[in-house]
Amino acid sequence: YDRRRQRQMCIRDSNNTYRANDALSSMFMGALRSTSSALKIGLGGAVFFFVETHFSLPRWDSSSILTWIIAFIAYDFFYYWFHRISHERQIFWASHVAHHQSEDYNLSTALRQTGTGFFLTWVFYIPLFIIGVPSYVFVSVASINLIYQFWVHTEHVPKLGWFELFFVSPSNHRVHHAQNEEYIDKNLSLIHI
């Protein structure tokens, strides 16, 4: 593949971090994932409703800030375990590997998601419904986490000092995406380090 042609195909920015073919591939995968999200919402939603209705402890008070803080931290905890297993077990890795296949690291990489993840992800969040997290608190917290996940996929944000000691940042998420042996399967959390 001609490097000059590849440079011409870059979407211009100061670091040439967006090659058109890679960015378009990531965006196309994100669009495909969006269509499978309807299945995830339907399947997961039905199971969550059933668990919330039949097996849940008393529902937490959604007007309490403590409910939201605990739900936010608990969501990140269960995401960590989902993400860790996605790196350690082949059936999960087969679904997650697409996200790590981009040769570039930019915002479009966040969109590079598989369409098969819905088969596996929702299972990890069942405990939240068992302990009494209201479904609309869960949906809100999941949405905030999803938005947060987007911005950490960039090379354009420098190190953020003390922030990186507590929260996932673009810098330490770049380590997660690195292919160096010592960095593989590191920094698996979504929000908290």
Task: Specify the residue positions occupied by each region the protein language model found.
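Juxtamembrane/interfacial segments at transmembrane-helix boundaries in multi-pass membrane proteins
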Residues: 43-69
